Amino acid sequence: MKLLPRLRLPYLFTVFGLLLTLGSCVETVENQQIVYFNNFSNLNLEGFENGKLFIWRNDTIAGYYHNEEVSVNVKDLPAHNFVKITAEILIHDSWDGNPDDGISGPDFWYLGYDRTELFRTTFSNSPCESTYCLYQSYPNEFFRVNRPKTGAIQTNLPGLCIFGAFANYTTRYQVEKLIEHSNPDIKIYMGAELIQENSPDPICDESWSIASIKVEAIQTNRK
């Protein structure tokens, strides 16, 4: 039988001390609370800039938007060092994703807070077959190549306008982002930069809306 080498006592104490140090550095959540939630069912747009509502499939949602930006101001947050933003959005009709042809794309959607753009991506509602597929970047930032509807939570909804009579032309996504933040107020904004030069009615061709938005304040044990 092969014996293991004898470890010196000082070495054991060094390893044990290192493990204790690492263990004490683990960041844990001390408090997490929802400070803002809106699914627009109560028609409340308090704190919104460019807020507007419409009813779609018997549900009240914010929108619909084209090349527009919308924001919500959330004030008097409790003590925190992180904020988690969760936005459920709907991508309507003929979004073309990544193609950069100056006629139909790229079709950008972005999310930010205060004066910082946090996330910029593209979405595509294109069919995807061996001979034709317009790729998107989501769930990654632009530029990445992913199949249309990658990361979606619902894909079989009908379009809103130009493809309103056809299934699979509205796609629902839940976008989640965690940011370091400690100020008592936060302004969250989202918007789109869409290109559709060959359409007489661009907003009917491509639009987006917001089904819900949630903001959570998180306090960890970080000093």
Placement of each model-derived feature along the sequence:
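Extended, low-complexity, turn-rich repeat/linker tracts enriched in Gly/Pro/Ser/Thr and Asp/Glu
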Residues: 90-105, 127-131, 196-200
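Extracellular carbohydrate-recognition regions
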Residues: 26-52, 116-131, 220-223
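Short beta-strands within extracellular/lumenal beta-sheet-rich domains
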Residues: 64-86, 105-109, 169-177, 208-211
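Terminal, low-complexity interaction segments
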Residues: 144-222
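Short edge-strand/loop segments of extracellular domains
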Residues: 101-118, 212-214
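Extracellular/luminal beta-rich ligand-recognition
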Residues: 116-157
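C-terminal motif of bacterial Sec signal peptides marking the signal peptidase cleavage site
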Residues: 21-24
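Bacterial N-terminal signal peptides that target proteins for export
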Residues: 2-13
